[in-house]
Swiss-Prot record:
The organism of origin for this protein: Campylobacter jejuni (strain RM1221)
Protein name (record): Arginine--tRNA ligase
Gene Ontology MF annotations: arginine-tRNA ligase activity; ATP binding
Family matches, as PROSITE patterns: AA_TRNA_LIGASE_I (PS00178)
Motif ('HIGH' region): 113-123
Cited InterPro entries: aa-tRNA-synth_I_CS, Arg-tRNA-ligase, Arg-tRNA-synth_N, Arg-tRNA-synth_N_sf, ArgRS_core, DALR_anticod-bd, Rossmann-like_a/b/a_fold, tRNAsynth_Ia_anticodon-bd
Top enzyme category: ligase
Length: 530
């Protein structure tokens, strides 16, 4: 709606201007401070300019009123125009708020957890954010592909194999073992050890078979990770292996050398990242010739940046903050625009239950498993709470609040609005088709404001995507639900003289809730279950 109104105003003003959304919808639906920017050029006060501009909008079908207030130009949308937009939305509900196909393309890499164990709650936040960003981008018309980078090489995978070997020796073969400083523990390791022993037999468990054992376990963990994601309604397009980039390392090093991005010192090869804003240079090839994790990651990012996407987006844990300058430096040395590599950081999550820290999983050792939380509160509540705050801010929540059936549980509160609307239609014995001819002229000021809010969803979605601020969607839904409940409690619907107008208004509110929830990966309920 905002873009339509912007274009209507531009036809008359014939210049560029900012269109704002005033908080108080009783004053205006939209406003522009254009008069202030024209004051110097026209040598007039903003109040006079705004008054002159307002006179140009007399008898415009879109607007109920256009007023000059303190130098601002305030617009109120007419009921007739809002009704036209409502008819379009209700006639084609599946297309409501959808964007036209755009040329801009994105590649999102997210989750990319080491395949050494099940996903924990820290992984879940980035996973939910990435999946919602994907749904939103595709809804708005962008080409948006997703990828999971599988770290299937290096020490972490070896440690997985070693941990299983030691578990077999200790728990099954009853040998005395000495655990290294770093190893994987938890019931899932014991389960893998038992399964591996049954599959491979006693003779297999020796030092030389650790790589084979690690590969077998890594594949099992990857299946488990995909199941964890699926449980939260998350599907990633493709999984790419770190190992698949081994052969491209030398060519990447040559390219970096050509562009003076690397140098040799102390028997190692260093990335000259300090030249590009990093705090120091970074080792990418060790003295023994083995590449560091950074080396493999540079090769992978070089490939991603070469695939022709307008922008590559990564979602990383907040502990990777210091990794950003070195990766951007490498991309610049390789001839790419580092602005086309966007990093979104997912901050830490603190989980409580009845005000106390949530218990760690015995299965995972010292982590809270994503699957445990989904099993306890459901994927809808998990997704909502992870989207309720900006991704790069710390999130603390008590899962007990998400099990309550009152307004303190936002998922329940919003769903109650959606279910309430279905209940009202059932009570009236009507369907949406029965109220399509209603012209909405009888709506009072609060009703018009509620209708405007429901129809304003697309502007919220565009803002959320462009700013990567997905919390704008749950914020919008909370306000919409609160305003709906207030309006419902203050106005008689079934049996009233303007029943059809109110039912049509409510159907728009329900459509906005259902659409926004769908983009968040949440099901809008038609009936509340107790």
């Amino acid at each position: 709606m905002k873009s339509i109104i912007f274009n209507e105003i531009k036809k008359i003003l014939e210049c560029d201007f900012a269109l704002e959304n005033p908080k108080d919808k009783n004053l205006a639906h939209f406003a522009t401070p254009l008069a202030f920017s024209l004051a110097k050029e026209l040598k007039k006060s903003p109040m006079l300019i705004a008054s002159d501009l307002a006179s140009k909008f007399q008898n415009h079908d879109c607007f109920e009123s256009v007023e000059a207030v303190n130098g601002y130009l305030n617009f109120r949308i007419s009921k007739t125009f809002l009704n036209e937009l409502a008819n379009q939305a209700l006639t084609n509900p599946n297309d409501f708020t959808k964007g036209e196909k755009k040329q801009e393309s994105f590649l999102l890499e997210y989750v990319s957890a080491n395949p050494t164990g099940p996903l924990h709650i820290g992984h879940a936040r980035g996973a939910v954010f990435g999946d919602t960003l994907t749904r939103l981008a595709r809804h708005l018309g962008y080409k948006f592909n997703t990828e999971y980078y599988v770290n299937d090489a290096g020490n972490q995978i070896y440690l997985l194999g070693l941990s299983i070997l030691l578990s077999v020796k200790e728990s099954i073969l009853h040998e005395n073992v000495e655990y290294p400083e770093q190893y994987y523990k938890g019931e899932y390791i014991a389960d893998l050890a038992k399964e591996a022993f049954e599959k491979f037999g006693k003779e297999f468990f020796s030092q030389e078979n650790i790589p084979s054992l690690a590969d077998w376990a890594k594949d099992k963990m990857l299946v488990l990770i995909k199941q964890n994601l699926e449980q939260a309604k998350i599907k990633i397009d493709s999984y790419v292996s770190e190992r698949s980039y081994y052969d491209a390392l030398n060519a990447t090093l040559e390219s970096l050398k050509e562009h003076k991005g690397i140098y040799e010192q102390e028997g190692k090869i260093w990335l000259a990242s300090s030249q590009k804003g990093d705090e120091k240079d970074r080792v990418i090839i060790r003295e023994d010739g083995r590449g560091t994790y950074l080396a493999a990651d540079i090769v992978y990012h070089k490939d991603k940046m070469s695939r022709g996407y307008g922008k590559c987006i990564n979602i990383w844990g907040a502990d990777h903050h210091g990794y950003i300058p070195r990766m951007k430096a490498a991309m610049e040395f390789l001839g790419f625009d580092s602005n086309n590599l966007e990093i979104i950081l997912a901050q830490m999550v603190s989980l409580l239950k009845d005000g106390e820290p949530y218990k760690m999983s015995k299965r995972a050792g010292n982590f809270i498993l994503m699957s445990d939380v989904v099993n306890e509160i459901g994927s809808d509540a998990l997704r909502y709470i992870f989207l309720s705050k900006k991704c790069d801010t710390h999130l603390e929540f008590d899962i007990s609040d998400l099990q309550k059936e009152d307004s303190s549980n936002p998922v329940y509160y919003i769903n109650y609005a959606h279910a309430r609307i279905h209940q009202v239609f059932a009570k009236a014995g009507k369907k949406i088709d029965d109220v399509m001819k209603a012209d909405l002229q009888s709506l009072n000021q609060d009703g018009v404001n509620l209708l405007f809010e429901a129809l304003n969803l697309k502007a919220v979605l565009n803002d959320a995507f462009e700013a990567r601020a997905l919390q704008k969607i749950p914020d919008y839904l909370k306000n919409l639900a609160a305003n709906f409940h207030k309006f419902y409690n203050e106005n008689k619907v079934v049996g009233s003289a303007n029943e059809n107008d109110l039912l049509k208004l409510f159907s728009l509110v329900a459509l906005s809730i259902k659409t926004a929830f769908s983009l968040m990966g949440i099901e809008a309920k038609n009936k509340m279950e107790h």
